[in-house]
Each structure stands twice: as structure tokens, then as C-alpha cells.
């Protein structure tokens, strides 16, 4: 017979070590051999933090009672089971779960779904995309404003050039039909200044008769008519000079004829347009208005 004693360093020294008494025989008992092998293997695999001391001693030849053997066996087996359970728990703690790539998973986990919907239904990175889009649009707007400003500046300059009056400008101090305008042109590398008469500015003539106001619109004559009149005047002046040399008495008669011709030319360029009469002519008109004095009305 032999005894096997198990004692742990973590147990208190006040308790007595538990002893397991086994009866050895020639034939092997299958019920006892398998658990012993398993427990001895677990004890050998257990970590070094819980070392176990095994002491063997000779037993007396006297056989113990079966009731005492059963009690000691139950206590010893429970102790061995606790040791095996502790060793298995340590192994589970040491073995970590293997990493699995997300591509190998067919279904999405709750965490991945939370990442996809963390910004109120929009995917992650959508804010950055929107900001980039807005930044691009703002840059395009600034470029458009620059191009419009550059295109608007030359148009304004062109307008200024078109609106610029001829140099030198007309004399604004002189008012009436006989205004003088100076024109310049180049001849043989020289600047020639000529004084000309511009077309009349007053386009309307006012005429009051029979209690009504009549307006006459002046139509500007063409350039060829002006040139013809100038040539005629020059020819007439030459003729007058020749006639003056011959007969000085015929000069006043010739001047009267010239004045008549000028009046005829002016009448051709003037067309009288009569507006609709609002006043009542004849005997039915109010004769009280005829006693009033004439008033001058200025319109702009």
C-alpha cells in the first residue's frame, strides 16, 4: 500500500494535508485508472504559480474500513477536480480570440451599422464632400465675378470714348441758331481748324393765334443741301463783287433778292404741325380769355 499527499502553497498551514489511501493489487481497476491518469496529466500541465508537492510513504498491511475509504476518496477527488478546473480557466484566459477580417464576415455587426449611420442617416465623410463641393463652387463664383469685372471695365471705357465730344468742343456760351463749332482736320501734316455752324438745337417753334398754341417742328436738312447752299452763296458773292464794280446802285436790289431766296430755303426746311384744338373757335368761345395779356411759357 502507498499514500499520496497533495499540498498547495496557497493553503493555510493550520489545516492538515489531505491524504489519499489506495490499495494496490495485481489486477488494474478501470474505474480508478482513467481518472488518475487524467488528474495526474492536469497536474503536470498546471502553471508554476500553483506547485504541488507529492509525498509517498509506506502504508501498514492492515486494510482500512470501506466506509472510511469512500469518504477519503470523495474528498480527494473533489480537490483534484478543483485543481483541474482552475488550470482550464487559466488556459481560457491565455487563449485570445483570433482576428477575423471584415471581408470574411458576411453579415454586418451592430458597431459597423452604427458607424454607417452615425451622422443622422448620412454616411461618414459626406460632410467633407459637401464642404469640398461648396469650396469649389465659391471659387468658381469668385472667378466669374473677376471675369465680369474685367469685361465690364473695357465696356465702360468704350462707352466713355463713344460719348466723348469732338475736340475742341462746341462753344456752349453762345445760344441761338448761329452757334459756332470748331472742327479740326489734317492737311499735309498740318492741323487745320475750321469754324462751322452746327444744326439748330431748338427743334420747335411756338406760335399763338386765335387762343391756341401752335408748334412748328424743324426738320434738319441733309448735308448735301448744306453744301449746295454754301456753293450757291459763294457763287452769288462772286457775282455781287463783279456787279459792285460795274454798278454800285444795283447792290440793294440784289440783297433783297438774296434775302427772299434765304427765306424760301428756310420755309422748305420747316413744316408746321398743328395740334388738335381744345378751345372752341367762333362765336361760342369764351371771349373773357381774349382780354388776358399774353404769357410766355418755357418748357424743357
UniProtKB/Swiss-Prot annotation:
Comp. bias intervals (Low complexity): 58-88, 142-151
Signal peptide range: none
Region: Disordered, residue numbers: 30-104, 142-170, 227-264
A biological process term (GO) from this entry: regulation of meristem growth
Function field: Regulates the size of the shoot meristem by modulating the CLV3-WUS feedback loop. Can repress WUS but is under negative control by CLV3.
UniProt record similarity statement: Belongs to the fantastic four family.
FAF domain ranges (all copies): 166-217
Protein name: Protein FANTASTIC FOUR 4
Tissue-level expression: Expressed in the shoot apex and young siliques. Detected in provascular and vascular tissue, but not in the vegetative meristem. In inflorescences, restricted to the base of the flower and to the vasculature of the stem and the pedicels, but absent from young flowers. Detected in the center of the inflorescence meristem.
Pfam families linked: FAF
Species whose genome carries this gene: Arabidopsis thaliana (Mouse-ear cress)
PANTHER family the UniProt entry points to: FANTASTIC FOUR-LIKE PROTEIN (DUF3049), PROTEIN FANTASTIC FOUR 4
Amino acid at each position: 500500500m502507498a499514500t499520496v499527499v497533495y499540498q498547495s502553497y496557497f493553503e493555510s498551514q493550520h489545516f492538515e494535508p489531505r491524504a489519499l489511501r489506495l490499495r494496490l493489487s495485481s489486477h488494474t481497476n478501470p474505474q480508478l485508472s482513467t481518472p488518475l491518469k487524467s488528474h495526474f496529466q492536469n497536474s503536470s500541465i498546471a502553471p508554476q504559480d500553483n506547485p504541488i508537492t507529492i509525498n509517498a510513504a509506506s502504508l501498514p498491511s492492515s486494510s482500512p474500513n470501506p466506509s472510511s475509504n469512500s469518504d477519503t476518496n470523495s474528498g480527494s477527488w473533489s480537490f483534484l477536480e478543483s485543481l483541474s478546473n482552475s488550470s482550464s480557466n487559466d488556459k481560457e484566459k491565455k487563449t485570445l480570440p483570433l482576428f477575423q477580417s471584415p471581408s470574411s464576415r458576411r453579415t454586418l455587426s451592430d458597431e459597423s451599422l452604427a458607424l454607417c449611420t452615425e451622422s443622422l442617416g448620412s454616411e461618414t465623410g459626406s460632410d467633407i464632400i459637401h464642404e469640398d463641393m461648396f469650396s469649389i463652387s465659391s471659387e468658381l463664383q469668385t472667378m466669374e465675378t473677376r471675369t465680369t469685372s474685367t469685361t465690364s471695365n473695357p465696356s465702360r471705357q468704350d462707352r466713355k470714348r463713344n460719348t466723348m465730344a469732338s475736340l475742341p468742343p462746341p462753344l456752349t456760351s453762345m445760344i441761338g441758331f448761329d452757334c459756332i463749332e470748331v472742327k479740326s482736320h489734317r492737311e499735309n501734316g498740318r492741323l487745320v481748324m475750321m469754324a462751322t455752324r452746327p444744326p439748330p438745337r431748338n427743334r420747335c417753334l411756338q406760335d399763338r393765334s386765335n387762343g391756341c398754341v401752335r408748334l412748328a417742328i424743324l426738320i434738319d436738312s441733309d448735308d448735301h443741301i448744306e453744301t449746295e447752299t454754301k456753293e450757291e452763296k459763294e457763287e452769288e458773292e462772286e457775282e455781287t463783287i463783279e456787279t459792285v464794280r460795274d454798278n454800285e446802285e444795283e447792290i440793294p436790289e440784289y440783297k433783297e433778292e438774296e434775302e427772299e431766296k434765304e427765306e424760301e430755303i428756310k420755309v422748305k426746311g420747316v413744316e408746321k404741325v398743328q395740334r388738335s384744338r381744345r378751345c372752341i373757335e367762333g362765336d361760342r368761345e369764351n371771349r373773357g380769355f381774349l382780354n388776358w395779356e399774353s404769357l410766355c411759357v418755357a418748357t424743357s
